[in-house]
Amino acid sequence: MKKEEYLEKVALANLWMRAYYEKDEPLASDEEYDALIRELRVFEEQNKDEVSKDSPTQKIAPTIQSEFKKIAHLKRMWSMEDVFDESELRAWAKRAKCEKNFFIEPKFDGASLNLLYENGKLVSGATRGDGEVGEDITLNVFEIENIPKNIAYKKRIEIRGEVVILKDDFEKINEKRALLNQSLFANPRNAASGSLRQLDTSITKERNLKFYPWGVGENTLNFTKHSEVMQFVRDLGFLKDDFIKLCANLDEVLKAYDELLTLREKKPMMMDGMVVRVDDLALCEELGYTVKFPKFMAAFKFPALEKTTRLIGINLQVGRSGVITPVAVLEPVNLDGVVVKSATLHNFDEIARLDVKINDFVSVIRSGDVIPKITKVFKERREGLEMEISHPKLCPTCQSELLDEGTLIKCQNIDCEDRLVNSIIHFVSKKCLNIDGLGENIVELLYKHKKITTLESIFHLKFSDFEGLEGFKEKKINNLLNAIEQARECELFRFITALGIEHIGEVAAKKLSLSFGKEWHKQSFEAYVNLEGFGEQMALSLCEFTRVNHTRIDEFYKLLNLKIEKLEVKSDSVIFGKTFVITGTLSRPRDEFKALIENLGGKVSGSVSKKTDYVLFGEEAGSKLSKAKELEVKCIDESAFNELVKE
């Protein structure tokens, strides 16, 4: 690397660092930033006389520019040296002149915080800032519930740690921001940092932040080991993670790293590595510091789960109900040992929200077995070659005209090849026509051998169609054919459900069956939208589906003997007209309780509101039960429910 290129990279690294620390809006992934810093270090080690004083390797963070007051730390807050593999870890240990007795703990991916206590009282809280001076966020710190406001130690002490947002809370925060049309946080770390730096303390409070201590600054403690210091701190009332170890040697450190890496997905908060630290405080004092790092500790980083790459195209996938899902085609990138070439974009509203274009640089995250997704678009890096992503007009598979609802774009052709197999699997499933023995694998086998080519072809299957197919003997074939014959006698609402119409589930299908009978598919938009519980989106979906498929539905009527169940409700029941929500695990399937409630004139809803009359709860009931108690909705267990319906 030449000096000119080095200085350009210094400027780029500073730009990325300011965006990260000052605005909580990163312009590059951690992996991309780390790689750039490593390039700078290589040049600087080989050209010591040409090191720029502006290089990020020579400072902790940019000078603070914010609406918060500045507050000086009593002792400097240092960054940590990163190591990425065993050889780098052993090289660090050699420089630290230490081969034994290491303190290790998770490196949580959050925002660093310095707490100052005097006379046992919390007097201030500050961000890391540039290491010497941070932002005074004391008022927000008082809103973090798990930070003790009073401790049993009366001398002056700085307690330092990481503020994190749990993964579940992060998803809830972004869901709320999406509803308010606010920009989404790219990751929990940015959310934690942004939550600490709110001018409105009530926002900090509602974010449910957690503080995990990892060290001390100014103090008059007399311990000889860091592990003793941290035990003392946690005994004051601070949170302790369950993965904290003392390792006798580097082999044990490596074993602990592998163990912690397996827990990465299970931990409720994000981790990006493991902290490895010399436990002997006298040796730590002897080792001292570089310009930027303590020599006695390092961050043993995990493989990146988030990287920057370029979006080079869009593929369209057709789902069971005909919904078109846009999938981003990416320049291949290695994420935690997996080569990622695509990422879901969910729908076209998501494309608009992200304002993503073909040829954009994007940040891609992969978590466990979850499909990779794009979390951020680096618009500042656009080069003028980007292209808009337009809504498709024709189905990519069958070329039929698509229904464009804005958020959802759908193919209405139920014989479309890409949706046919999944349509058949849904059609014969337990909640639909309930054809015993015609499971997913059998459907795929029959489709592969062209024995099933349409939904109707199920009812034209013959004994000879199964002959020669693996696993089919006379008894099995006869049982399956008998099950198909029995399925001809089914309730109308099950048939409507089986068609897989977008937005039309079992409850809506029952309403259509009871309201219109076999003429349900010949109604107007106004007739649909006036049904209780139906909205414009449901009505539009019905109109478009029946417009395309009304003759097919009439053909089905010739194949099936559809029954219209009359719902006989007891108007004198104590639960007549009452709304129930069911949550948790009960002794019988939830559908049985639902049917009983409806037969007694009640209704079952999927969400709790002020209009809910009862919440029937079982074991492991979750947020619905909590919300019901907040709204003072009557909550009953199974025993109380049984007594209620007996009345």
Swiss-Prot record:
GO CC annotations on file: cytosol
Pfam families, per the entry: BRCT, DNA_ligase_aden, DNA_ligase_OB, HHH_2
Domain named BRCT: residues: 570-647
Residues involved in Zn(2+) binding: C395, C398, C411, C416
GO biological process, one term: DNA replication
Name of the top EC class for this enzyme: ligase
Disulfide-bonded cysteines: none
Reactions this protein catalyses: NAD(+) + (deoxyribonucleotide)n-3'-hydroxyl + 5'-phospho-(deoxyribonucleotide)m = (deoxyribonucleotide)n+m + AMP + beta-nicotinamide D-nucleotide
Record EC number: 6.5.1.2
Keyword annotations from UniProtKB, A to Z: DNA damage, DNA repair, DNA replication, Ligase, Magnesium, Manganese, Metal-binding, NAD, Zinc
Superkingdom classification of source: Bacteria
GO molecular function, one term: metal ion binding
Catalytic residue list: K107 (n6-amp-lysine intermediate)
Names of the cofactor(s): Mg(2+); Mn(2+)
InterPro entries to which the protein is assigned, alphabetical: BRCT_dom (IPR001357), BRCT_dom_sf (IPR036420), DisA/LigA_HHH (IPR041663), DNA_ligase (IPR001679), DNA_ligase_AS (IPR018239), DNA_ligase_CS (IPR033136), DNAligase_adenylation (IPR013839), DNAligase_N (IPR013840)
Binding positions for NAD(+) per the UniProt entry: D30, E31, E32, Y33, D34, S79, M80, E105, R128, E162, K301
Record keyword Phosphoprotein present: no
Similarity remark: Belongs to the NAD-dependent DNA ligase family. LigA subfamily.
Matches recorded under HAMAP family: DNA_ligase_A
Task of the protein: DNA ligase that catalyzes the formation of phosphodiester linkages between 5'-phosphoryl and 3'-hydroxyl groups in double-stranded DNA using NAD as a coenzyme and as the energy source for the reaction. It is essential for DNA replication and repair of damaged DNA.
PANTHER family to which the protein is assigned, alphabetical: CHROMOSOME TRANSMISSION FIDELITY FACTOR 18, DNA LIGASE
The protein, known as: DNA ligase
The organism's taxonomic lineage, starting at the top: Bacteria, Pseudomonadati, Campylobacterota, Epsilonproteobacteria, Campylobacterales
